């Protein structure tokens, strides 16, 4: 019975990790339909969550204060942009848009935090491949949209 429980728990863990990995693919692998506003909002809120996470990682490190401020600015700009898109595309009022964007950003922040924690446990790396990939993607996107680093 104990062996069956262990096998069941192991399978459940594997399945849940695969579901998380599937749902939290790198942004550069997300299929983008240029006319789908939901994708624009999703990507912008993911970038906002990423920059919030990066701000939290860097703000307490010696010599990283300026970089932490940059991440904080990018987080704020992406959050504002996502809320504006929610107002434009979803016809949300400003309070609803801010609330939904804040919740989504917090959820993505937690996903990045969990993802980085798993990477540290698995191979000792500070950042996961998803986090590294998304960081490059979001930095590129922000440069294209004239958000300076």
Place the predicted regions along the sequence by residue.
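Sec-dependent signal peptide recognition
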Residues: 2-10
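N-terminal signal peptide c-region/cleavage motif recognized by signal peptidases
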Residues: 16-18
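Cleaved targeting-peptide boundary
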Residues: 20-29
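Short N-proximal segments of mature Sec-exported proteins
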Residues: 32-91
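Compact alpha-helical subdomains of small soluble proteins
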Residues: 74-149
């Amino acid at each position: 019975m104990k062996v069956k429980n262990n096998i069941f728990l192991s399978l459940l863990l594997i399945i849940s990790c695969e579901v998380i990995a599937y749902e939290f693919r790198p942004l550069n692998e997300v299929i983008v339909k240029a006319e789908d506003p939901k994708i624009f909002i999703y990507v912008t809120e993911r970038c906002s969550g990423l920059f919030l996470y990066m701000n939290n990682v860097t703000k307490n490190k010696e010599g990283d204060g300026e970089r932490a401020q940059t991440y904080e600015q990018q987080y704020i700009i992406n959050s504002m942009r996502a809320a504006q898109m929610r107002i434009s595309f979803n016809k949300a009022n400003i309070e609803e848009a801010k609330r939904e964007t804040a919740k989504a950003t917090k959820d993505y922040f937690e996903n990045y935090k969990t993802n980085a924690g798993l990477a540290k446990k698995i191979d000792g790396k500070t950042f996961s491949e998803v986090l590294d990939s998304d960081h490059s993607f979001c930095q590129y996107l922000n440069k294209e949209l004239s958000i300076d680093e």
